[in-house]
């Protein structure tokens, strides 16, 4: 990091969070403005999307890739007319393609809104409730763990050490009689 910008491995220039730029009411953006003219600035919250490969992490490889042959199959000896088979293939493929497009047109944006809200709530709860609750619990349980540790070292350690010394002299010998 240098001079109010982040540069990633591809050479993209990212803006620095406002607190690292100086006073939030008077950020020192003049020096940064001169450097911005050299490279294109990318905001950390915007991202280019790939319109060709829409599943770059392969989330739906095993679930959604269903073709005609995966659903409908005629065994040897039981074949319909070739024209019927071709028409069935075309009907299945076109119906699946256009019905998916229709459903995504109607429900895609509302579902994206619902899932966006859901994951925003989930992130908010994790950041502002779960992690602080766990940290609080760990701080509160620390005194109990100290008492438990003292108990174990005072009572259990000597007991098990004595039992270990008792059984340390036990020897087993096996003889095979003929």
UniProtKB/Swiss-Prot annotation:
Chain spans, region Required for homooligomerization: 2-94
Post-translational events: Phosphorylated at Tyr-14 by ABL1 in response to oxidative stress. Ubiquitinated. Undergo monoubiquitination and multi- and/or polyubiquitination. Monoubiquitination of N-terminal lysines promotes integration in a ternary complex with UBXN6 and VCP which promotes oligomeric CAV1 targeting to lysosomes for degradation. Ubiquitinated by ZNRF1; leading to degradation and modulation of the TLR4-mediated immune response.
N-acetylserine PTM sites in chain numbering: 2
Classification via Pfam families: Caveolin (PF01146)
Source organism, top-level taxon: Eukaryota
Keywords, comma-separated and alphabetical: Acetylation, Cell membrane, Golgi apparatus, Isopeptide bond, Lipoprotein, Membrane, Palmitate, Phosphoprotein, Ubl conjugation
Family: Belongs to the caveolin family.
InterPro entries assigned to the protein according to its UniProt record, in alphabetical order: Caveolin, Caveolin_CS
Annotated positions of the Phosphoserine modification: 2, 9
Residues with the N6-acetyllysine modification: 5
GO biological process: angiogenesis; angiotensin-activated signaling pathway; apoptotic signaling pathway; basement membrane organization; calcium ion transport; canonical Wnt signaling pathway; caveola assembly; caveolin-mediated endocytosis
Intramembrane region residues: 105-125
Span list, region Interacts with SPRY1, SPRY2, and SPRY4: 149-160
Lipid attachment residues per UniProt (S-palmitoyl cysteine): 133, 143, 156
Listed name of the protein: Caveolin-1
Region of interest called Interaction with CAVIN3, as start-end residue ranges on this chain: 82-94
Sample GO molecular function, one term: ATPase binding
Any coiled-coil regions, as ranges: none
Record-listed Phosphotyrosine modification sites: 6, 14, 25
